[in-house]
Swiss-Prot record:
CDD domains: GDC-P. This is Probable glycine dehydrogenase (decarboxylating) subunit 1. The glycine cleavage system is composed of four proteins: P, T, L and H. In this organism, the P 'protein' is a heterodimer of two subunits. The lineage of its organism: Bacteria, Pseudomonadati, Myxococcota, Myxococcia, Myxococcales. It comes from Anaeromyxobacter dehalogenans (strain 2CP-C). The keyword Oxidoreductase applies. It comes from the Bacteria.
Amino acid sequence: MRYHPHTPDDVRAMLDVVGAERVDDLFRSIPQALRLDRPLDLPPAADEIALFSELRRLAARNETAHPPFVGAGCYPHHVPPVVDQLLLRGEFFTAYTPYQPEISQGTLQALFEWQTFVCLLTGMDVSNASMYDGATATAEAALMAGRITGRDKVVVSAALHPEYRKVLATYLRSTGDEIVTVPFGADGRTDLAALQQAVDGRTACVILGYPNFLGVVDALPEAAAIARKAGALTVSATAEAVSLGLLQAPGALGADVAVGTFQSFGNPMSFGGPAPGFFATREKHVRQMPGRVAGATVDKQGRRGFVLTLSTREQHIRREKATSNICTNSGLCALASTVHLSLLGKRGLAELARLNHGRARMLRDAMERAGCRPVFSGPFFNEQVFDVGDAEAVVAKLAKRGIVAGAPLARWFPDAPSAKGALLCAATELHGPELIQLFAGAVRS
């Protein structure tokens, strides 16, 4: 049942029926002494984030856990309730591909807007209608680079998300392409001298995290220049997409392909997924791009409509000619990101990104006061690595206090600087000053 508020005419008609002059007359039987003759003593209005923070404070009287300080590719962010409410609409509530445009205009238009958002944030010309996740998008970018250049070597930064690198290795195992991994330096950025040495005439692409797995904003322009000189493409992979509200777009820094995940927009952590992957590139590469594109067109009556176009996947064309076998993908998750980004707007996204960076700086200051130095000196967004002495022990200890600490870096990089004590920690808009101080104090104790 839909809710329609009463108009003044509706109220007047109802009062006339019961013989009352005004609404207050309906409460005449209540003694005056029992009526409230002053405004309610309520606190000032609060935005959703502050309201949820207060509700969490009240709920903390029970056995509960704080927003996790672990990121590592999947981040805790506030998801406005309206996102889930819109997803529940019958027109949208399916992850299935809108093959029949005549009955799927709403979904197709939403995917079209998703592509617009992806292009705006990445500085690219074209985007597809989403991928499974950031890892498969990265692997598909390497395959596309091989098709475009005709080369069989992929150079990857060791600071790229380890799980992205594993999926990439799985994809390229069957193609026979060589993967060369380049180390990172003391600042947490890709070692450019090693990159220069690794890139040659066989290199199809160079892949960097932006920001990378260590939370560091990598040297994307310099890496792109090295790749371009050798005739290779540059792929930027972004796991924390909120960073694109503050950092310069990958396309503006020389990247030829921008991939990653929009989990940070409209999608909860959900123990690691699902979350929509994005894929964007230059217009000249559009016919080599995997997946599907939602396009705008006009029908024979001249009316604007939306359709799937450039669907060069194995269900649509001959398998050996297909650019991808990506199927139903993460359409519903992409819709959630689209709704969230629509609510934020350009200014809201910039404010959210600045807030995330501010909280990360606050965490850095608190951890340094607690005696935990940052391991890497490179620029960061909302994630950093700290030396806490014994990362695994700290994680176990804080878990008993209801605090989900960061990710021990030694699980992926046993030979990294300060590996035993290295703890990868993220701070977002959900981590207020009190929680950050609580975390730093718990680590120190």
